[in-house]
From Swiss-Prot:
Record lineage: Eukaryota, Metazoa, Chordata, Craniata, Vertebrata
Matching PANTHER family: TYROSINE-PROTEIN KINASE HOPSCOTCH, TYROSINE-PROTEIN KINASE JAK3
GO cellular component: cytoskeleton; cytosol; endomembrane system; membrane
Residues annotated as the enzyme's active site: 945 (proton acceptor)
Protein name: Tyrosine-protein kinase JAK3
Residues reported to bind ATP: 824-832, 851
Length: 1100
């Protein structure tokens, strides 16, 4: 056993078994540091928070506060984990044994290539864990293996792997104890480092075999000890090898049930590298539901059961596109264990300030929230934030110490003769909970009181006066060293600040011809528009499609606002969400006309005026929550709306008969950034106060203010009295930081007050707003709706039936509910249409892309079914998502249903936005496409049609591979296949062996990827496209078929020319991809880190 150190617990160690006879005690076991029993901390009678116990254990193990969030407490058999907020009550006869373990895992912990902690610059990133955590993780893994907790196989190969792990274990012991291998093996048996089942196998061998195995271990141990690797490198190797052998050890699986049914239980699996997956029954084939950044909210409710099963809990996870996963857990502890796991991963990956529900919220985080205190961020991030705030003297940041659990750090900006400087003060918290700061005469009961005492205390730090004036409070989604960046996962969108600065708001929309529009009655006027009801008619393949539309005509008197009006149209045309109004396009004939879907019940403010007291509080809560979902979607995209009010919220479905109401947020219209002060004053109280201060930028926080005012309007049944005041009195209301009258529901009034905080930095994120609304919906606020006895209240659904249960596959779309909207694309083999799947017939269903064949012969149907099966099996951030299929009558026809990405294909996107897409963005796209192709290759899938036209754009920073019509799966045991019926092919993207012999492989896809790189860096300019360049090389008097001439050119070594602005390193990669021999081309797994390194090395 290792000698005592400063990490050894101060409490004496006694029994560590659940069967301990000691009464009235709680024991927290720590992983053993070597052979022997585990260390433990013991606590006597009283109440203990799980998070406080974790802090005590972290201090004993030397775990710093930065890494505290990786750990949690579990029962001794690991059947249940406890959220940080759990309270353990120890009474006279109780004895509880807990285990302190690292719960949150990430792929390839070590180094910076796969995952790392966020840094201000790409060269300032740091590893996820430090040496103390590494040591703890090693002890945890080693204990699991040698105790028999991990299931192990006993094939000859696996026996060799475990013997290798034993050698690494012995080598690190030799390093720690400074012993030679021979000396170590006199006191420690190599079999003590093996799983029990393998120990038994070896013990059952004859003497000669046991001696041979021991000699092999000794020789291997001498070789390892002779190398230069230190103890920590040996530990890291041990951990990586064990996680490679047992990847399930880094995931957690939960057995769940389908609500309202008595079927076989399903399985939920949570993993740090890909989020939540599910499987029906006991099948081990898991389907991905969502990654952590896609989660919008999580809620826990009592399951709708009666009788003995009343303890069951229903957990609902809502993802960004509106689909939900509902899973029924046998009890509250299991449900909280699952939610705490998802909650913890979300904080580590997405937002260190967020928690999904109060039942699992870490108490230390709640304390930080109340005190406007940051977590244990480093000094670099604190100074960076003060600089971003303008480096104003007196601004300060309060943060937890990254080194000490009982200390806080005050970092403030002070004025010196040389300019602004940054000084720090240490705040200590004593065991009684009092806070003290050197220079203050007495301790204070809270941080808030201590800081108030600092404001006019005359404190000096290093000779500089410390006069605090304003606090830089924590903000949602702030990037810091507390965030883990996972390479190869969907990039988080950057915070949006202004439509003019936002990527998606570049003018880009579908143009609608005048003769396709039919005008009906006038519906009134907007601030800048005349509004008409109308009809849009489109003819596709001789078939006429009619859609009822709303026509917004820009008033000619407001020509100066035309650009902002078109920016709003562009924004709405490039987003797709159930609770956002669909924009068909813009008609530019004479006046600018925005063509939108027609929402039948109109604006919700008018509806509330008509219905008055007949509208229940429960109905209003659901409407408010749906609005929050829409604004959360825009917030995640970094897109401010800027004009949130009840008149912009349209009611698509009234609700009733078990269905909830359904709203859609309309376009923002003209942005506040171009309006005069008089017009902005007219929008009080919906416009945020900062928008009146001649600001030329519109930030996301403005929408929180508008949401608060709209929520007040919805629950009050009409606009606030302030709307009828004179302009001067309205402005005075803002100058005095007035508040709207408080609603009678205290919690809702508090939420509105938070949203309408005059300091934009104090307003909550929409995820936090949704969390608080969930608390209202699942509380006694439902009683206010006064439902009729015997009639069930409407479900709290996001998208009107778009649910995904843990044990149910929602892959069949009824053809009659697919409503055609427009044609997205048409090729030689099929067409893709934009449709709305609308089973309720009220235009509330989700938008989807639907692919169907042009010709439906038996061969085409077979190939189409193969394409569907391939896409269905793929789950990657960089491949378009499969949604399901739709069958015609008698299953005579088949359609593929996919996610709809409104930004279109990469080819058109590059052509439209060439001026603002710089090299770093092109490299990001290239890396993402390469990662997607690497994923396909690992699944033996050859795409065969990789080109920019078949890459779809989800956002300014995210692309996905699509169109698997030509894709093939490689036969087992083969690295290529030969196409017998090649048909029409994109020859200018094909490798030589594909052109001459119809041979396709992962290497032929690499050739096509080289052509895609060429397309990226030429911005898909038609004048220098691959086909145009090769035809130019062939000359005007070319003889024979183009394919033969192309083969001759390639055999002569002719290749596409280097694009003018392409970096030399990318040109070299292109040439490697175009090597004549397939074996000389790099694999996607080799190209991916090279492109990643190029992208990370670019400025910005």
């Amino acid at each position: 056993m290792a000698p005592p150190s400063e990490e050894t617990p101060l409490i004496p160690q006694r029994s560590c078994s659940l069967s301990s006879s000691e009464a009235g005690a709680l024991h927290v076991l720590l992983p053993p540091r070597g052979p022997g029993p585990p260390q433990r901390l013991s606590f006597s009678f009283g109440d203990y928070l799980a998070e406080d116990l974790c802090v005590r254990a972290a201090k004993a193990c030397g775990i710093l506060p930065v890494y505290h969030s990786l750990f949690a407490l579990a029962t001794e058999d690991f059947s249940c984990w406890f959220p940080p907020s759990h309270i353990f009550c120890i009474e006279d006869v109780d004895t509880q044994v807990l285990v302190y373990r690292l719960r949150f895992y990430f792929p390839d912990w070590f180094g910076l290539e796969t995952c790392h902690r966020f840094g201000l610059r790409k060269d300032l990133t740091s590893a996820i864990l430090d040496l103390h955590v590494l040591e703890h993780l090693f002890a945890q893994h080693r204990s699991d293996l040698v105790s028999g907790r991990l299931p192990v196989g006993l094939s000859m190969k696996e026996q060799g792997e475990f013997l290798s792990l034993a050698v690494l274990d012995l080598a690190q012991m030799a390093r720690e104890q400074a012993q030679r291998p021979g000396e170590l093996l006199k006191t420690v048996s190599y079999k003590a480092c093996l799983p029990p089942s393998l120990r038994d196998v070896i013990q059952g061998q004859n003497f000669v075999t046991r001696r041979r195995i021991r000699r092999t271990v000794v020789l291997a141990l001498r070789r390892v000890v002779a190398c230069q690797a230190d103890r920590y490198a040996l530990m890291a190797k041990y951990i990586l090898d064990l996680e490679r052998l047992h990847p399930a050890a880094t995931t957690e699986t939960f057995r769940v049930g389908l609500p309202g049914a008595q079927e076989e239980p399903g399985l939920l699996r949570v993993a740090g590298d890909n989020g939540i997956s599910w499987s029906s029954g006991d099948q081990e084939l898991f389907q991905t539901f969502c990654d952590f950044p896609e989660i919008v909210d999580v809620s826990i409710k009592q399951a709708p059961r009666v009788g003995p099963a009343g303890e069951h809990r229903l957990v609902t996870v809502t993802r960004m596109d509106g689909h939900i996963l509902e899973a029924e857990f046998p009890g509250l502890p299991e449900a909280l264990s699952f939610v705490a796991l998802v909650d913890g991963y979300f904080r580590l990956i997405c937002d260190s300030r967020h928690y999904f529900c109060k039942e699992v919220a870490p108490p230390r985080l709640l304390e930080e929230e109340a005190e406007l205190c940051h977590g244990p961020i480093t000094l670099d991030f604190a100074i960076h934030k003060l600089k971003a705030a303008g480096s104003l003297p007196g601004t300060y940041i309060l943060r937890r110490s990254p080194q000490d659990y009982d200390s806080f750090l005050l970092t403030a900006c002070v004025q010196t003769p040389l300019g602004p400087d940054y000084k720090g003060c240490l705040i200590r918290q004593d065991p009684s909970g009092a806070f003290s700061l050197v220079g203050l005469s007495q301790p204070h009961r809270s941080l808030r009181e201590l800081l108030a005492a600092c404001w006019n205390s005359g404190l000096r730090v290093d000779g500089a006066a410390l006069n605090l004036t304003s606090c830089c409070a924590p903000r949602p989604k702030e990037k810091s060293n507390l965030i883990v960046v996972r390479r190869g996962c969907t990039p988080a969108p950057a915070p949006g600040c202004s439509p003019s600065c936002c990527a998606l708001t570049q003018l880009s929309f579908h143009t609608i011809p005048t003769d396709s529009l039919e005008w009906h009655e006038n519906l009134g006027h907007g601030s800048f528009t005349k509004i008409f009801r109308g009809r849009r008619r489109e003819v596709v393949d001789g078939e006429t499609h009619d859609s009822e539309v709303l026509l917004k005509v820009m008033d000619s008197r407001h020509r100066n606002c035309m650009e902002s009006f078109l920016e709003a149209a562009s924004l709405m045309s490039q987003v797709s969400y159930p609770h956002l109004v669909l924009l068909h396009g813009v008609c530019m004939a004479g006046d600018s006309i925005m063509v939108q879907e027609f929402v039948y019940l109109g604006a919700i403010d008018m509806y509330l005026r008509k219905r008055g007291h007949l509208v229940s509080a429960s109905w209003k809560l659901q409407v408010t929550k749906q609005l929050a979902y829409a604004l959360n979607y825009l917030e995640d995209k970094g897109l401010p709306h800027g004009n949130v009010s009840a008149r912009k919220v349209l009611l698509a479905r009234e609700g009733g008969d078990g269905n909830p109401p359904f709203i859609k947020l309309s376009d923002p219209g003209v942005s506040p950034t171009v309006l005069s002060l008089e017009m902005l004053t007219d929008r009080i109280p919906w416009v945020a106060p900062e928008c009146l201060q001649e600001a030329q930028t519109l930030c996301l926080e403005a929408d929180k203010w508008g949401f608060g005012a709209t929520t007040w309007e919805v629950f009050s049944g009409g606009p606030a009295h302030i709307t009828s005041l004179e302009p001067a009195k309205k402005l005075k209301f803002y100058e005095d930081q007035g508040q709207l009258p408080a609603l009678k529901w205290t919690e809702l009034a508090g939420l509105i007050t938070q949203c309408m905080a005059y300091d934009p930095g104090r307003r909550p994120s929409f995820r936090a707003i949704l969390r608080d609304l969930n608390g209202l919906i699942t509380s006694d606020y439902e009683l206010l709706s006064d439902p009729t006895p015997g009639i069930p209240s409407p479900r709290d659904e996001l998208c009107g039936g778009a649910q995904l249960y843990a044990c149910q596959d929602p892959a069949i779309f009824e053809e009659r509910h697919l409503k055609y909207i427009s044609l997205l694309g048409k090729g030689n083999f099929g067409s893709v249409e934009l449709c709305r799947y609308d089973p309720l017939g009220d235009n509330t269903g989700p938008l989807v892309a639907v692919k169907q064949l042009q010709h439906s012969g038996p061969d085409q149907q077979r190939d189409f079914q193969r394409e569907i099966q391939i896409l269905k099996a793929l789950h990657s951030d960089f491949i378009v998502k499969y949604r399901g299929v739709s069958y015609g009558p008698g299953r005579q026809s088949l359609r593929l249903v996919m996610e709809y990405l409104p930004s279109g294909c990469l080819r058109d996107f590059l052509q439209r936005h060439r001026a603002r897409l710089h090299t770093d963005r092109l490299l990001l796209f290239a890396w993402q496409i390469c990662k997607g192709m690497e994923y396909l290759g690992a699944r033996r899938c050859v795409h065969r049609d990789l080109a920019a036209r078949n890459i779809l754009v989800e956002s300014e920073a995210h692309v996905k591979i699509a169109d698997f019509g030509l894709a093939k799966l490689l036969p087992l045991g083969k690295d290529y296949y030969v196409v017998r019926e090649p048909g029409q092919s994109p020859i200018f993207w094909y490798a030589p062996e594909s052109l001459s012999d119809n041979i396709f492989s992962r290497q032929s896809d690499v050739w096509s990827f080289g052509v895609v790189l060429y397309e990226l860096f030429t911005y898909c300019d038609k004048s220098c496209s691959p086909s145009a360049e090769f035809l130019r090389m062939m000359g005007p008097e070319r003889e024979g078929p183009p394919l033969c001439r192309l083969l001759e050119l390639l055999a002569e070594g002719r290749r596409l020319p280097p694009p003018p602005t392409c970096p030399t390193e990318v040109q070299e990669l292109m040439q490697l991809c175009w090597a004549p021999s397939p074996h000389d081309r790099p694999a996607f797994g080799t190209l991916s880190p090279q492109l990643d390194a190029l992208w990370r090395g670019r400025p910005g």
